[in-house]
Amino acid sequence: MSSLEISSSCFNQETKLPLSLPLVEGSTFEPPGKDMNEVEEKSKDIIKFTSEKLSVDEVSQLVISPLCGAISLFVGTTRNNFEGKKVISLEYEAYLPMAENEIRKICSDMRQKWPVRHIAVFHRLGLVPVTEASVIIAVSSAHRAASLEAVSYAIDALKARVPIWKKEIYEESSSSWKRNKECFWATSD
């Protein structure tokens, strides 16, 4: 008897699961080993800065857990306009040691406020063309309320605390560095 397989890989480990399991009439399926309620899984915080294009699928796969019924995502993309000017791309720079440290603190804050399992924060550096993602935040939790609230907190905290700078590049060959209005440590002009 042949069965279809679904293949999933994460951290260079591949797992194959049968699409459906054959059952004898009157029998029930019980997974081998531990009861599903006894599954132990270490929580993880995954932080990445890259000049490569970001993938929503890749980031969301990193936070999947058999203990979770919810994954919430925030995807920030480059829009094509600002105050009547046509934007062709954004350019991001960061002070990486401090940026990573601040994001780790944000992850810790999230864990104190909500019962979340896994957190992934990916941020693009360099040029980000219109419609492409500049930031993806994914959070998994047992229930949706925690992951939705946590992901909203994460993007607000990231914009307020993390040293990442954005330059808007306009169609008419001009550009402008932008300050996050939420950023607590930036001085006002």
Curated annotation (Swiss-Prot):
It catalyses: 2 [molybdopterin-synthase sulfur-carrier protein]-C-terminal-Gly-aminoethanethioate + cyclic pyranopterin phosphate + H2O = molybdopterin + 2 [molybdopterin-synthase sulfur-carrier protein]-C-terminal Gly-Gly + 2 H(+). The modification Phosphoserine is found at S20. It comes from Bos taurus. This is Molybdopterin synthase catalytic subunit. One of its GO terms (cellular component) is molybdopterin synthase complex. Transmembrane segments: none annotated. It is an enzyme of class 2 (transferase). Keywords: Cytoplasm, Molybdenum cofactor biosynthesis, Phosphoprotein, Transferase. It is found in: Cytoplasm, Cytosol. The lineage of its organism: Eukaryota, Metazoa, Chordata, Craniata, Vertebrata. Its EC number is 2.8.1.12.
